[in-house]
Amino acid sequence: MVLLAGTANRRELAVERAAKKEAVESLNGLFQTTSVAIVAHYSGLTVAQMQKLRQQMKQAGASVKVSKNRLAKIALEGTDVAAIGPLLKGPTVIATSSDPVAAPKVAVEFAKANEKFVILGGSMGTTVLNVDGVKALASLPSLDELRAKLVGLVQAPATKIAQVTTAPAAKLARVVQAYASKSEAA
């Protein structure tokens, strides 16, 4: 009987190890592809508040992960955002996004509305960010907004060039029209 109980425990441990290994691989894949990672304490938030945070992150193109800190630290090894490892103490949540502004912007806005959500810091690539760094990053325009501004800047000179090249022809047409009107009047 004791042997059977021991065998069941070994199977459970093997399944648990496999699940942990899968979680580490999944997190590592996420950390490999992200450009920014934000760490925050979420102790005291309700399930509804966490769902709202996840929804806001998803709408912004970011994601939120809650995992065991030990597993997250293992998954961080060899990634650009590995510097956030020391921040993983206590009940932490990790927000990530490929847009360097999306996750920080949502996290800062959520922290303003929920005092129990406390931003600890983060990482943008290999650059470590403190709380002020995360807030500064959140104040920047998003990648899409920057692209729109860049397109506007590129299009503006083209529009001006078109106006300059058509202006002499328009002036010439007005001179000819005035001369024709003057000839008809005389």
From Swiss-Prot:
Belongs to the universal ribosomal protein uL10 family. InterPro entries: Ribosomal_uL10, Ribosomal_uL10-like_sf, Ribosomal_uL10_bac, Ribosomal_uL10_bac_type, Ribosomal_uL10_CS_bac. It comes from the Bacteria. Part of the ribosomal stalk of the 50S ribosomal subunit. The N-terminus interacts with L11 and the large rRNA to form the base of the stalk. The C-terminus forms an elongated spine to which L12 dimers bind in a sequential fashion forming a multimeric L10(L12)X complex. GO terms for cellular component: large ribosomal subunit. One of its GO terms (molecular function) is large ribosomal subunit rRNA binding. The keyword RNA-binding applies. Forms part of the ribosomal stalk, playing a central role in the interaction of the ribosome with GTP-bound translation factors. One of its GO terms (biological process) is translation. This is Large ribosomal subunit protein uL10. It holds the Pfam family Ribosomal_L10. The keyword rRNA-binding applies. Keywords: Ribonucleoprotein, Ribosomal protein, RNA-binding, rRNA-binding. PROSITE patterns: RIBOSOMAL_L10.
